[in-house]
């Protein structure tokens, strides 16, 4: 695979946990992280994504195809 991949992040505020929860949908239901601020949640998700990509490449597994999701405001 060549070129830069752009993966989705779904970021939601959790009133119960008082944190932002981030899901990485292309990577399955277990690909989640969180942060106490929006910026921290995004940074944590970027770290998780880097680990997922590195792990898949190391194991010789194909990377999931990026998907397009509707944007909401």
Language-model features: where?
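Short aromatic-glycine-(Arg/Gly/Cys) micro-motifs in beta-strand/loop hairpins
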Residues: 12-28
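Short acidic, gly/pro-rich beta-turn/loop elements at beta-sheet edges
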Residues: 19-21, 32, 43
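Short, charged, surface-exposed hinge/linker loops at domain edges
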Residues: 1-8, 39, 43-73
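Short, positively charged
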Residues: 3, 10, 14-17, 35
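Short glycine- and Lys/Arg-enriched binding-loop motifs that mark or flank ligand-binding interfaces
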Residues: 26, 31, 56
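A short, exposed loop/beta-hairpin motif centered on an aromatic-Gly-Thr core
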Residues: 29-40
